[in-house]
Amino acid sequence: MVAVLTWALALLSAFATVQTQKGFWDYFSQSSGDKSKVARVQQQKLTWEPTSLKDSLEQDLSNMDKFLEKLGPLSGQGREPPGLPHDPEGMRQQLQEELAEVRARLEPYMAEAHQQVGWNLEGLRRQLKPYTVELMEQVARRVQELQEQLRVVGEGTKAQLLGGVDEARGLLQELQTRVVQHTGRVRELFHPYAQRLVTGIGRHVQELHRSVAPHAAASSARLSRCVQTLSRKLTLKAEALHARIQQNLGQLREELSAFASAGAGGAEEGANPDAQMLSQEVRQRLQAFRHDTFLQIADFTRAIDQETEEVQLQLAPPPPGHSAFAPEFLQADSSEARSKLQARLEDLWEDINDSLHDRGLSHLEEP
């Protein structure tokens, strides 16, 4: 609840303009009357039905424009309601100072939660790193094997290429056969590594769920959704990576087969293929496959970093003074920023509702 309160105060201070804040405090002072009334309202909040309260909030927050408009200055809307303090400006200033003091006291707890969640997510990244390292090692190893298995340079090979049309054509047809055979074998060898990566993601993300639960500011339901979403996204990305590796191998097979077929056709027309050129072409195609696959694995690693950083912001937002505190919200008049803010407000509502519900149950259980 501490982090939830701090996040609420942070949203107010970070996203409302000075005029909007003034309107909010005018509205607060006009509707509060006196401290006893505020206390009664707070006590009543514990007995409100969550559904009706959420419906009311959603009606007020139907879009961000209306929300900010409602927080605008209310002093020009007609008669002054009863119970208005004699010095609303002074009351507003006092409330702002008190809230700033409360936020300053709560921010260390929020920073600690952000750090604890970050450490756990960093642990997830460390646990998944061996899978990607192993995958890159396998790519390098299989490329080296293919290069050895598809060699066409040697004294016997040169003699065969120069021995006549039939000999050269036979050698290139044999190369085609070896290309299909060995690339197919490599494709099969990559399946277990892809399966291990997917299994590892599921297992380590579940471990993350258990380790991050004590530190997350989010409600238990939202925590479960965030973790499940992270697991699903990483699993889909791992499966997509495996599909791209298979696609790369299929493309390599087609390119090498087409090259060998073209060489065999040239041999039938009387051209003598150059063994050195054939070997260089095979090597270049294999290195291109290795390079492209390494880039795709690196992209997958960056995706893990990006997804875990997003989860950290969702589960334990940093304090307002932190450099990572909602930088995307600082763009004025941005529809994307407003949409993200609306989503954050929905998350905040769920966390507050969950906390109030828990507090209400504990209050009822007291003797």
Curated annotation (Swiss-Prot):
Modification after translation, per record: Phosphorylated by FAM20C in the extracellular medium.
Signal peptide: 1-20
Name used for this protein in its record: Apolipoprotein A-V
UniProt keyword list: Chylomicron, Coiled coil, Endosome, Golgi apparatus, HDL, Lipid transport, Phosphoprotein, Secreted, Signal, Transport, VLDL
Encoding gene per record: APOA5
Organism taxonomic ancestry: Eukaryota, Metazoa, Chordata, Craniata, Vertebrata
GO terms under biological process: acylglycerol homeostasis; cholesterol efflux; cholesterol metabolic process; lipoprotein metabolic process; phospholipid efflux
Subunit architecture: Interacts with GPIHBP1. Interacts with SORL1; this interaction leads to APOA5 internalization and sorting either to lysosomes and degradation, or to the trans-Golgi network.
Assigned protein family: Belongs to the apolipoprotein A1/A4/E family.
Pfam family, one: Apolipoprotein
Primary location group: secreted
Positions bearing Phosphoserine: S56
Chain segments carrying region Disordered: 71-90
